[in-house]
């Protein structure tokens, strides 16, 4: 690679600095990945989720107060089968009111929660959920009006895994915590005492350190073969651009609400705040490899961070895989569940234009008003939404699902068809969605839509809609 004189001088300066910089600055003594405990839901079995203070270590040796569920930082994974009833009990033992949302669960607001269903401190709420949908990876998190970002940042986030009869029969990695790995991504600012720092009065939040399941850029000892990653972006504002640092592909198999027709080979995958994806990685051969966000960094990139004051992460490694055992001669490619393409032959009943101005916290020139219903739709209908934005941002909605039809007037490839509830938007593109409404929401408990950035959402960049019978 040919360097300009300016680049040569910059790198010479950095090289000089490197000789006097402690090795510990770039040495990576990674912690082991923590796997959230699993709550396996049997038919009618009660599930108790106690939201209360907990403790963890962000800086080694410094135990600090955080929030969590059932006594741990972050929340346990809840796994349920489609067709089951779930008797939930949420108990709020935190010092402030709390609302909960299960993003990705397709059900009425009376079941999944809403910003208008607050659980006061020292109180409980016990909904009964009827789970009837295709397999997916959802996440549950604080959704408290004007306060969701702070509460999620403190630790109120976890996964729901919904399975159906077809997903259980598919030849996919399914040993939870072994080759079926949950990854909850959060970027954080941690002070010298090991305490979380956040200014909730800013429009957006970008931390300097990346934590996965509560551990900073960890490693994971994994058996050779195919590995399944269930990745949830629980960061408040940060968007991730995921890839492997050895240049090998990721294989996308599912988005937030369902599977694709077949695994799609991708060099990198975008992940908006609140978005979930499932990907496969082939680790049958080779040495350790890392899942990273952004481009692979070299020595000079690492040292150069000392001179930059921006939103870049100190370490862009999401997870380092350390394969164990011998390669298998029978490393069979996994097969996905059957795909019903007829689900996507949709009859459009109405079209709607939605323009986002995130930094002004406006949608169609209006800021959020908890007393205003922005529109009403009929259950069972499908609408085409035309989305535009003045800045790059994630878009999401509650209680309904959509497929991405076009980006910048170009049809999305058939192989990428899948149901979603979150999508990343670019300011230079118009994105069209086909939105399907299958569950009701009343005026007292409406569904919400808007940006998926929780900071901007708390500051008013969202709206409400009703789904009537």
Swiss-Prot record:
Compartment(s): Periplasm
Domain of life: Bacteria
GO biological process: FtsZ-dependent cytokinesis
Cell cycle as UniProt keyword: yes
GO MF annotations, alphabetized: copper ion binding; oxidoreductase activity
Cell division among keywords: yes
Matches recorded under InterPro entries: Cu-oxidase-like_N, Cu-oxidase_C, Cu-oxidase_fam, Cupredoxin, FtsP, TAT_signal, TAT_signal_bac_arc
A UniProt-annotated Pfam family: Cu-oxidase_2
PTM field: Predicted to be exported by the Tat system. The position of the signal peptide cleavage has not been experimentally proven.
Family: Belongs to the FtsP family.
Name the record gives this protein: Cell division protein FtsP
Organism: Glaesserella parasuis serovar 5 (strain SH0165)
Encoding gene per record: ftsP
